[in-house]
Amino acid sequence: MKEHEVLANAFAMPLTSPAFPRGPYRFVDREFLIITYRTDPDKLRAVIPAPLEFDEPIVRYEFIRMPDSTGFGDYTESGQIIPVTFYGHKGNYSHSMYLNDEAPLAGGRELWGFPKKLASPSLTRESDHLLGTLDYGPTRIATATMGYKHQPADLEAVKKSFETPNYLLKIIPNPDGTPRICEIVQYPLIDVTVKGAWTGPGALALTPHALAPVADLPVLEVISTIHILSDLTLGLGKIVHDYLKK
């Protein structure tokens, strides 16, 4: 393979059989269980990378079921999203993400900088409630429950919430371990259709784990719980802050 051929095909690793395809990345029947909770402000401050900031010590714990995603297949994800501001503009910062599928794990980290790790999340219907669980190895580190479709949510308000910018901290090292890329990436969710959304009673329990520290942002008070069914496209990102150019 000639040098120009290498460059022409240098989309993802491995060169001759990339772990994920080129986009667009469309998700059909993407289902969310989101529990919004209040946490310790000092602990939250310790994990949000400047120049991102927070107004209120709020975390959204999410379980996401993705049965039909272009190029990524059928998988489930779980993690923590933090409402932030970026120079005064409201957004969402992805703090932790755990999933059970290699293609979106590799693609999420390499393309956008999603903080993805391999684990075993699930989102299921259990009689009269939704059940979200996250296992890291044999250890259960997160359990969420929600009463099933108790009250309809405002679909227009839910769709509007998908327009909020999303932020990631992307880090890729040089071969010697020093940072080659260290930047804040912003990405959108586009072509969103909200098929249904419901609220209801919710509960969330987090268990400490050395390598999956979701409990480091403790649950002090559950504020709200929502269940969403949607179709959407995960848009590509742009660099909005480069730590290495300061």
Curated annotation (Swiss-Prot):
<dbReference type="Pfam" id="PF06314">
    <property type="entry name" value="ADC"/>
</dbReference>
<dbReference type="GO" id="GO:0047602">
    <property type="term" value="F:acetoacetate decarboxylase activity"/>
</dbReference>
<comment type="function">
    <text>Catalyzes the conversion of acetoacetate to acetone and carbon dioxide.</text>
</comment>
<dbReference type="InterPro" id="IPR010451">
    <property type="entry name" value="Acetoacetate_decarboxylase"/>
</dbReference>
<dbReference type="InterPro" id="IPR023375">
    <property type="entry name" value="ADC_dom_sf"/>
</dbReference>
<keyword id="KW-0456">Lyase</keyword>
<feature type="active site" description="Schiff-base intermediate with acetoacetate">
    <location>
        <position position="116"/>
    </location>
</feature>
<dbReference type="InterPro" id="IPR023653">
    <property type="entry name" value="Acetoacetate_decarboxylase_bac"/>
</dbReference>
<protein>
    <recommendedName>
        <fullName>Acetoacetate decarboxylase</fullName>
        <ecNumber>4.1.1.4</ecNumber>
    </recommendedName>
</protein>
<comment type="similarity">
    <text>Belongs to the ADC family.</text>
</comment>
<keyword id="KW-0210">Decarboxylase</keyword>
<keyword id="KW-0704">Schiff base</keyword>
